[in-house]
From Swiss-Prot:
The lineage of its organism: Bacteria, Bacillati, Actinomycetota, Actinomycetes, Mycobacteriales. This is Large ribosomal subunit protein bL21. Belongs to the bacterial ribosomal protein bL21 family. Keywords: Ribonucleoprotein, Ribosomal protein, RNA-binding, rRNA-binding. GO terms for biological process: translation. PROSITE patterns: RIBOSOMAL_L21 (PS01169). Part of the 50S ribosomal subunit. Contacts protein L20.
Length: 103
């Protein structure tokens, strides 16, 4: 069984292993920069680490590959019998990360 970690960023949690490429909420880092992510859980074979004092020693590092946008979401507000229509679109800004290490 390979080792992996659960990291927290942008109000969400992601399961990552070394070499994984994940899209996370936008981070304030330039492409090519190295970032460190807070860890919620580490699994290394049969060993599961979830205690806060043990997780403080663990670091998940990654490299920012690029900044991109997610799919377009269309919002349409409508009120009956008044002629009120409001259309809006949104594309969430994302950061593509490559996990380089779990130590």
């Amino acid at each position: 069984m390979a080792s992996y970690a659960i990291v927290k960023t942008g109000g969400k949690q992601y399961k990552v292993a070394v070499g994984d490429v994940v899209k996370v909420e936008k981070l304030d880092s330039e492409p090519g920069a190295s970032v460190s992510l807070p860890v919620a859980l580490v699994v290394d074979g049969a060993n599961v680490t979830s205690k806060a004092e043990d997780l403080a020693k663990v670091a998940v590092t990654g490299e920012v590959l690029e900044h991109t946008k997610g799919p377009k979401i269309r919002i349409h507000k409508f009120k009956n019998k008044t002629g009120y229509h409001k259309r809006q679109g949104h594309r969430q800004q994302l950061t593509v990360l490559k996990v380089t290490g779990i130590k």
